[in-house]
Amino acid sequence: KRLLQNLGIEINQVIPEGGFIEDLQNLPKAWFNFVPYREIGLMTAVYLEKEFGMPYVSITPMGIVDTAECIRQIQKHINELAVVSLEETVDYEPYIYQQTKFV
């Protein structure tokens, strides 16, 4: 959650954290699904992509390389949808640089 918040991304729904069946109706509002642990949620993310065209990111943000790649995948999905909805694109490279420059 903290990584997404640091990037300024509003979290639509965390499944199954404190969720109710009624909350599932909010799933289509997401621009992408984030699956930080492939063992939990990957099959659902694949299904949602296949059935509804909802992209997903399934890179676990652990370590410098994987965290940077995860952020770049998130950026890619946001920018693809931002172009369609005529919103501004994002550039998270400065954030990645800031987080890794002293390592």
From Swiss-Prot:
Keyword Nucleotide-binding attributed: yes
Recorded superkingdom: Eukaryota
Cofactor(s) listed in the protein's UniProt record: [4Fe-4S] cluster
One Pfam family, short name: Oxidored_nitro
GO biological process, one term: photosynthesis
Top EC class, one word: oxidoreductase
Pathway, per record: Porphyrin-containing compound metabolism; chlorophyll biosynthesis (light-independent)
Family to which this protein belongs: Belongs to the ChlB/BchB/BchZ family.
The name this protein goes by in its record: Light-independent protochlorophyllide reductase subunit B
Species of origin: Spinulum annotinum (Stiff clubmoss)
